[in-house]
Amino acid sequence: MVGSVLMQRMHAERDFALIEPAFFSTSRVGQMGPFIGKESAPLKDAMSVKELAAMDVVVSCQGGEYTNAIFPQLRASGWKGYWIDAASALRMRGDAVIVLDPVNMDLIKDALSRGVRNYIGGNCTVSLMLMGMHGLFKADLVEWVTAMTYQAASGAGAEHMRELVRQMGFAHQAARAALEDPAGAILDVDKAVTSALRNGSLPSAQFGFPVAGSLLPWIDKDLGNGQSREEWKAQAEGNKILGREDRPLPIDGVCVRIGAMRCHSQALTVKLRRDLPVDEIEQMLAEANEWVRVVPNEREASLRELTPAAVSGTLQVPVGRVRKIALDKSASYLTAFTVGDQLLWGAAEPLRRMLRILLDVAS
């Protein structure tokens, strides 16, 4: 799915006109490659180290198992090319950079000058948080952050998106008779939906539990300390992206899966290093990069512009609900709410832009 979105973005930005691509597959070797404005050659074998080693750049959206199987073999063969990857497998390696160029372009340029060859996309939620709050991190105003996330089905995969829609349909069908009865009581509708979610017949092979009409308050593995792996990534990856591994900012929170299709949302609480007026903070956020848009902290604007429905399929990362909160009179605390497309800035776009950076370096 990330690969499909990456292809769409490369078409839209005319990237294919700048490169000579070869396409690889683990399951459809020899079949015709994708149409890229012209016919492409048959698909090559993605398990062939020899064929991969002929590439100057490999862009992988195949997942961590593939990376763990092929990457060591490819490097062991003597390949000196650039590896760009959506998977998490290599993110925390010392010889890899997590790429988010609007935020860490200086880090990327420094790595290129030092001969670093591995450039990895970050965790979707972490990347979207850093894009939205870039202005505060850039100004070194952040002492710590907590993020309460509302994560879309797309973060779990394409089949999870399909299952979410099936669950929605299943719940509707279960309550349909009560819903369409003009004299019916809403409690009858509620009872029918609740029964559908609990009776074991709801499609749940992917999630394991109901998401439609419910939520999942745990994402990824249990680290055994009360924290999920998804929650751990915020501080680990966030500080690596910011180049602060030697002086890490505390970043933590609770990650929750909800019934949105492809946009992650986050409610943030930030402790600031110094007190600033809200209008100055909003200006910093708005000017940090061209994709952030500050939404006025007003009811209508928030409901219209600060939702997955409004943002899905766009590169915009709106930030709203920005206000001070009185947790402690001796310090300055801020709340904010941000939304972003998990498949764009959360996955495909940093990879696409890293490829363009390499092309610029080569030229």
Report each predicted region and the residues it spans.
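N-terminal Rossmann-like NAD(P) cofactor-binding subdomain of oxidoreductases
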Residues: 1-206, 246-250, 317-318, 322-328, ...
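Charged docking surfaces used in two-component/phosphorelay signaling
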Residues: 58, 153-363
